[in-house]
Amino acid sequence: MLDLITFLFGEVRTATGISTNQSKAYKINDVTSGIIKFKNNIQGSIQLSFNGSENRDEMVIVCSNGTLKFSLMTNDNLTVIKDDKTYEISFEDIEHVQMPYIKRIVDTLLGKDDFDTTGIYGLRTQELIETFDNSTTIEY
């Protein structure tokens, strides 16, 4: 999810997180709140709860002229809400979900693409996860 957020909104300028073991069911944090400010001045908040009574998988992006809602883990419809109207957009399942990623890597190795292979995006995602989980702040 955090990698998708940075893909959609760009590089992070600063992020702050608060996590706690609210349920005490396991020895691990199960509730996390995060605030992110991106280098392009977009701001957002994240709320994750792994102990709720409801199993809900939804990302909501509220923009100045509409709202997007979609699942992170399923291929459910994307919902667009604009001007008090709701639209549903569906996507067909692809047979091999990893294939576009693998193709870009192969094409990069063959010199036909410039897919980033430095691992910096994975590192930035891991830094955000640790920032939220450790209830700290990170700045770039």
Regions found by a protein language model. Give the residues of each.
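Generic detection of short hydrophobic beta-strand segments and adjacent strand-loop junctions
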Residues: Y87-E92, I138-Y140
